[in-house]
UniProtKB/Swiss-Prot annotation:
Protein name (record): Peptide chain release factor 3
InterPro entries assigned: EF-G-like_DII (IPR053905), EFG_III/V (IPR035647), G_TR_CS (IPR031157), P-loop_NTPase (IPR027417), PrfC (IPR004548), RF3_C (IPR032090), RF3_dom_3_sf (IPR038467), RF3_GTP-bd (IPR041732)
One Gene Ontology term, aspect cellular component: cytosol
Swiss-Prot/TrEMBL keywords: Cytoplasm, GTP-binding, Nucleotide-binding, Protein biosynthesis
Signal peptide as annotated in the record: none
Lineage: Bacteria, Pseudomonadati, Pseudomonadota, Gammaproteobacteria, Cardiobacteriales
Coiled coil start-end: none
Domain named tr-type G: residues: 10-279
Domain of life: Bacteria
Function: Increases the formation of ribosomal termination complexes and stimulates activities of RF-1 and RF-2. It binds guanine nucleotides and has strong preference for UGA stop codons. It may interact directly with the ribosome. The stimulation of RF-1 and RF-2 is significantly reduced by GTP and GDP, but not by GMP.
Source organism (scientific name): Dichelobacter nodosus (strain VCS1703A)
Gene for this chain: prfC
Length: 531
């Protein structure tokens, strides 16, 4: 791919799309690929019998339900830049996967439903972005439907998300009366049109200059009021400030309709120019700059069985510095060993190509035979660890019941591989033979159950179990750890990394145990460092 893609790390634009479920994120992802030339025809995400399934929703359950369950990675060239788009789960049960994905991007695109405004999941994701001072573009979607007043939406974004809004495009009408959008910086009106059901690109008329007499002909009943509205907007609205955007303090706001392909191209063109190139990343030892010659990278996601024909596991690695070349040897810091990477991959969702080269900001896929974990750092020899890639204590627990006892080996293999992806965890109590699965949301159990059956030919069911919460255990010394284990064996388990975990039957039990053992650290999250 290197013959059509820029080889300069400064041309990389690596970002994630964040939104509440049903705000149109997966549809927008499709349309970005359409405008980027990565796909020729956009498939409707839900429903229509003749429509293709959305390119980024390749897992069977995602195709059936029309929700994004795992993060896909897609790369395409656009206006001289290389766009690396990480599609995150839209369903709240998969917030862990989304959180980790946000550690691998340099900016984010927030999608808001023009009728619903700022919703709960958007608020949570913005909190994560704020912690990392991630620059945010905003796309207010579904302009082809009746929604709230644009100014009201801007006010809500500023009030609820604590970020200034700088309108860049502004709608002329909405719903059935939608006529177009006006780009304030380009002083250009783009008239509303749609491709065939939104499946292909179809440009409407463009008029340069808000004072152009052509607008009086095309919009005789509303153009005077609209000119006044824009005059008012320029006076009271925030002008776009690039530095404030890069600091995560201000978001440029675009309006459009992803399903109609409208307003998307204007936003994507600006994004390619304004979004930041790869940024420095912190490690336990020092900060790594993208322009450094030697390659460094970290694994933020593992996906099992992306292709049932291959029965594979792919580790997704973000390149933070240097250049990856096919066949090069890398140092896997956690294991202290050198590994050869002969056949790394790049992605167009489930489509894969062998990567000959990759640069800072790019995401590559490495075949994983059980030795790579989320959070692993790869270098050309230097011992350092990238930080900030989290695991979360599960909120929900189920006991795994196997329907065919002869399938136990396949069950353990399947659970181990699916847990490697980080979306679910399983625990083996020190006493007894139970297998306990932990997750953030109920949907994760359904996904694991379906994937065990589809990918590993293992049928099982999940039963409720008397576990309220879990905490990773650390002790100041071996003596304190042994005392703790001796007195709490009934509530202790090992996770799939053989880390010791306290599984509490109730919140009260956890609190009392913490009070009885003040020297023991009970961690609700853990970093993937050197485990």
């Amino acid at each position: 791919m290197s013959d059509i893609l820029s080889q300069d790390w400064r041309d990389r634009r690596t970002f994630a799309i964040i939104s509440h479920p049903d705000a149109g994120k997966t549809t927008l992802t499709e349309k970005l690929l359409l405008f980027g030339g990565a796909i020729a025809l956009a498939g409707a995400v839900k429903g229509r019998k003749a429509a293709h399934h959305a390119t980024s929703d390749w897992m069977k359950m995602e195709q059936e339900r029309g929700i994004s369950v795992t993060s896909s990675v897609m790369q395409f060239p656009y206006h001289g830049k290389v766009i690396n788009l990480l599609d995150t789960p839209g369903h709240e049960d998969f917030s862990e996967d989304t959180y980790r994905t946000l550690t691998a991007v340099d900016s984010a695109l927030m999608v808001i439903d023009c009728a619903k405004g700022v919703e709960e999941r958007t608020i949570k994701l913005m909190e994560v972005c704020r912690l990392r001072t991630t620059p945010i573009f905003t796309f207010v979607n579904k302009l082809d439907r009746d929604g709230r007043e644009p100014m009201e939406i801007l006010d809500e974004i500023e009030r609820v998300l604590h970020i200034q809004c700088a309108p860049v495009t502004w709608p002329i009408g909405m719903g059935r009366s939608l006529k177009g959008i006006y780009h304030l910086a380009r002083d250009t009106v783009y008239f509303y049109t749609t491709g065939k059901g939104g499946a292909s690109i179809n440009h409407g008329e463009t008029v340069v200059g808000l004072d152009n007499p052509r607008l009086d002909t095309l919009l005789p009943d509303i153009i005077d009021d609209f000119r006044e509205e824009i005059h008012f907007l320029r006076e009271v609205g925030n002008p776009f400030d690039h530095e404030a955007y890069l600091r995560g303090e201000l978001t440029p706001v675009y309006f459009g309709s992803a399903i109609s392909n409208f307003g998307v191209e204007e936003m994507l063109t600006d994004f390619a120019q304004l979004a930041p190139p790869p940024r420095p990343h912190r490690t336990t030892e020092r900060e790594v700059a993208p322009q450094e010659e030697k390659l460094t990278g970290f694994v933020f996601k593992i996906q099992a069985n992306m292709d049932l024909k291959h029965r594979d596991r792919i580790a997704f690695m973000r390149v933070n510095s240097g250049t990856f070349r096919a066949g090069m040897k890398l140092w896997q810091v956690r294991l202290g060993r050198e590994v050869k990477i002969p056949d790394a991959l790049t992605f167009l969702a489930a489509e894969r190509e062998h990567a000959q080269e990759a640069f800072a900001g790019d995401i590559i896929g490495i075949h994983n035979h059980g030795t790579i974990r989320i959070g692993d750092t790869f270098t050309e020899g230097e011992s350092l660890q990238f930080t900030g890639i989290p695991d979360f204590a599960p909120e929900l627990f189920r006991r795994v019941q196997l329907k065919d006892p002869l399938k136990m080996k396949a069950l353990l293999k399947g659970l181990a591989q699916l847990c490697e992806e980080g979306a679910t965890q399983f625990f083996k109590p020190l006493i007894g033979s139970d297998l306990i699965l932990g997750a953030i949301g109920v949907l994760q159990f359904e996904v694991v159950q379906q994937r065990l059956e589809t990918e590993y030919n293992v049928k099982c069911q999940f039963e409720s179990v008397a576990v309220a919460t879990a905490r990773w255990i650390e002790a100041p010394n071996d003596k304190a750890l042994k005392q703790f284990i001796d007195k709490n064996q009934a509530n202790l388990a090992h996770d799939h990394y053989e880390q010791l975990v306290y599984i509490a039957p109730s919140r009260v039990n956890l609190q009392l145990t913490q009070e009885r053992f003040p020297d023991i650290v009970f961690s609700q999250t853990r970093d993937h460092l050197a485990q």
